[in-house]
C-alpha cells in the first residue's frame, strides 16, 4: 500500500506516466492475487513454474489494510478512477468489521481471523512507519468526505477523542495521528464543476 501511495503521489507531482503505471500495476496485483473472499492476505509467493499461480496466505494485519486503503485513495485522487475508491471502501469496511474495538475505540492490530493470540494489541505509536491506527483513522476521515459516510467519520472521531491526551502529552510519538487530527479539525473544500 505504501508503494502504491508513493507512486500515485509521485505521478501527481511529477506527471511521470511510469509512476502511475507502477501504482496501478501494484494495486491491480494486490487486488487480484492477495484478496480472497473479501479478506486481504499478508504474503504472496510466486512460483517458478509459470503454469501455476502464486500462493497468498496469512491473514493481513491492521497496517496492511490501512496502508493499502490509503494507497488506493491516493491512486483514486491521481486518476479519479472509481474502481480505486470502491476498492478502498471495500477494504475499509472489512477493516472496521474485523479490527475495530467496540469497547474503547481504535483498531486492534490483529483481526478475529488470527488464531491462538494471548492478547490483541492496539498500537498507536508512529515511528519510522506510521501506525495502523493512525493510517486507518486518516483513511476513515478521507472516505467519510469522499463518500459522505457518517459512520466512518464517527469512528475516526472516536479514535481522535480517545487519544487526545496522549497526543497532547507526547506529540512526537503520534505524528501521523496528528495529521489525521489536522484533517479532522480543518474543513475540506468541495468544488462542483457543472457544464
Language model feature labels by segment:
Residues 1-195:
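Glycan-recognition and catalytic cores of secretory/periplasmic carbohydrate-active enzymes
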Amino acid at each position: 500500500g505504501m508503494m502504491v501511495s508513493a507512486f500515485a503521489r509521485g505521478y501527481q507531482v511529477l506527471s511521470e506516466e511510469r509512476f502511475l503505471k507502477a501504482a496501478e500495476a501494484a494495486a491491480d496485483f494486490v487486488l487480484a492475487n492477495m484478496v480472497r473472499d473479501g479478506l486481504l492476505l499478508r504474503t504472496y509467493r510466486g512460483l517458478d513454474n509459470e503454469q501455476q499461480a502464486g500462493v497468498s496466505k496469512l491473514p493481513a494485519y491492521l497496517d496492511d489494510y490501512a496502508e493499502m486503503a490509503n494507497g488506493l485513495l491516493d491512486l483514486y485522487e491521481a486518476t479519479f478512477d472509481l474502481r480505486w475508491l470502491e476498492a478502498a471502501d471495500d477494504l475499509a469496511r472489512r477493516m472496521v468489521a474485523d479490527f475495530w474495538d467496540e469497547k474503547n475505540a481504535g483498531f486492534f492490530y490483529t483481526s478475529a481471523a488470527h488464531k491462538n493470540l494471548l492478547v490483541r494489541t492496539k498500537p498507536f505509536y508512529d515511528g519510522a512507519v506510521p501506525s495502523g491506527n493512525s493510517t486507518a483513522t486518516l483513511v476513515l476521515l478521507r472516505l467519510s468526505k469522499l463518500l459522505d459516510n457518517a459512520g466512518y467519520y464517527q469512528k475516526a472521531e472516536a479514535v481522535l477523542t480517545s487519544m487526545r491526551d496522549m497526543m497532547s502529552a507526547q506529540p512526537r510519538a503520534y505524528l501521523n495521528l496528528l495529521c489525521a487530527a489536522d484533517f479532522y479539525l480543518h474543513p475540506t473544500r468541495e468544488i462542483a464543476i457543472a457544464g
